[in-house]
Amino acid sequence: MSSVDPRTPVLVGAGQFIQKPDNPVEAIEPLAMMREALEAAADDAGARALLDRATHTWVVKGAWPYTDPGRLLRNEFGNNSKTGLSTDGGNTPQSLVNKASLRIQNGEADIVLIVGAEGIWSRRRAKRAGERIPYTDQAETSPDEVLGKDVTMSHPVELERGFAMPINFYPIFESAFRASRGETIEQHRDRVSEMWEIFNKVACANPYSWVRNPMTAEEIRNPGPANRLVGFPYTKAMNSNWDLDQAAALIVCSAEAAEAAGVASDRWLFPQSGTDGADTNFVSNRRDLHSSPAIQVAGRRAMELAGVSPSDIDHVDLYSCFPSAVQIAATEMELGIDRQLTQTGGLTFAGGPLNNYVTHSIATMAGVLREDAGSVGLCSANGGYITKHAFGLYST
């Protein structure tokens, strides 16, 4: 594509990996899962050379002991890339795509590998069986770059009152959102359960989903032996699920590097725009509990930069740790809450691998947009308690 500026950032490869062996000790460690996902991304691009030529290897922080996994991966692929390790936050993957795109555009990077993995499911089950999955030892080392900034998101007064986890906050956001719409409790529970049933149907068709068991709105809504009430109105089937083994990877590079590696133009996906934003860190300091000024500003700005309106966006994947996160984002961006708002099936069913879910959503979106050439896709990302946000619009 000689008409494209050589410094144009393009997403050329997306790979996902999932494992659920009958014997958990047969599972591979997260580092090996990352390698599998990166190789799948390179194969998706049709160019293993991208792994050899990478200038940056960025890893989304996970629940594992590696201090600089990017260096271990760099050594396996035999490249001399600069390594990066992110801070915590579900906003991280989209934020890294935004950062990579800017650096590529500015000539500060050529080929950026973005990857993350979690092996919580196998590790837990191996431990219950008195076994241990061996992890690669890494001498204490530091990445070339720490990506992002850790922020304190719980005020001491909030902690004193037991507000320390997402499940303490998001049900309150849900009730506040219901009240803002004037819904009764029962109307609201019915509507949210019906929305989550749609997410479940999408997940059942996604080969990389962790949970692919069909659930009706009634089954999602009502507590039961396998679906306990976690925080009203949320049952277990409305909560993010991180008890899983999943990995995902993206390869973002310059148009020039894509051509040099022999990546066919039909694999290219263009980041049309990307934005980041943040709400007030402490929930107790916010003006209300049913809105997000940062999503409104950063989300709409992403659309403005891409030159699209909500009605122009064909495919959407909103961060879906809990239903309130989806509804608040959809409302602030004027997308509406009645359309399909997931491509994966969401963090309950497709899976919520801690900080790395959005790597999966972008990877899934890549396949959707290639199948629907010329269409526009939106991915949103959320970290904390509707605190840290990132947005990306993509098209072929």
Question: Residue spans of the language-model regions?
Answer:
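C-terminal catalytic subdomain
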Residues: 351, 355-396
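Conserved "HGTGT" condensation-loop signature of ketosynthase/thiolase-family condensing enzymes
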Residues: 1-85, 102-109, 116-244, 248-250, ...
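Short acidic donor-binding loop at the edge of a beta-strand
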Residues: 110-111, 376
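Conserved phosphate-binding catalytic cores of ATP/NTP-utilizing and phosphoryl-transfer enzymes
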Residues: 94-102
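A glycine-rich, Thr/Ser-enriched phosphate-binding loop motif common to dinucleotide/cofactor-binding enzymes
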Residues: 92-94, 294, 356-360
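Short beta->alpha junction loops
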Residues: 85-91
